[in-house]
A protein has these predicted regions:
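Domain-terminus/edge residues, biased toward the C-terminal soluble/receptor-binding domains
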Residues: 2-3, 7-188
């Protein structure tokens, strides 16, 4: 017997993709594979019908029904980067139902949500005064792109605010944390 939740499956899949990208790219998008001279088709039907789908896992038990964790990566128009969405569909009545419901969720997510880049990796986001340093100020930024997912059309209303630690006293190391980012939509 084994038990899990949709949330845990999504966390596990997110870590799989992030921590083992070379294995993910090599194995999870294959439409079939051969082992011990036996050809096995991938039961993830979305791989055959949606070129943006690149995995992940099908399953079936009498208790859980037909299940599918699907991943899709699509370009963000005009943004210069792509976005990945995951779906976890559990308890459907058939293989085709799990594919249909997963595709609906992916299409809904891509059609109704946008990713906004608040800050670009390694670019100064702000400058702050520094005490007892050779320089009078320090530039603050982020070690990675800061991306936020919001409802379509609300991207212009998203704002980031860096709440810095006070006071900033030298010496400050590169990549040292000097504050907290607060993200607000309509001042909430």
């Amino acid at each position: 017997e084994h038990y899990t939740t949709a949330r845990y499956l999504s966390v596990l899949t997110t870590r799989l993709i992030a921590d083992f990208p070379e294995f993910y790219a090599k194995y999870y998008s294959k439409r079939d594979y051969t082992y011990n001279n036996i050809r096995q088709p991938n039961r993830n039907r979305l791989l055959a019908i949606d070129p943006s789908v690149d995995g992940v896992k099908t399953g079936h038990t009498d208790a859980a029904g037909y299940c599918l964790i699907a991943s899709s990566r699509r370009e963000q128009p005009g943004q210069g980067f792509s976005r990945r969405l995951l779906t976890v569909v559990l308890g459907t009545a058939s293989e085709s139902a799990r594919a249909i419901e997963s595709q609906k969720l992916l299409n809904y997510g891509f059609a109704n949500f946008d990713v906004v880049r608040l800050y670009q990796k390694d670019q100064p986001a702000a400058s702050y005064p520094v005490w007892k340093g050779a320089a009078s100020e320090v530039k603050a930024g982020f070690g990675g792109n800061v991306l936020v997912t919001v409802a379509r059309g609300s991207g212009e209303r998203v704002k980031g605010e860096i709440e810095r630690m006070q006071p900033l006293v030298a010496a400050i190391e590169q990549r040292q944390r000097i504050g907290t980012l607060r993200v607000r939509l309509d001042d909430k």
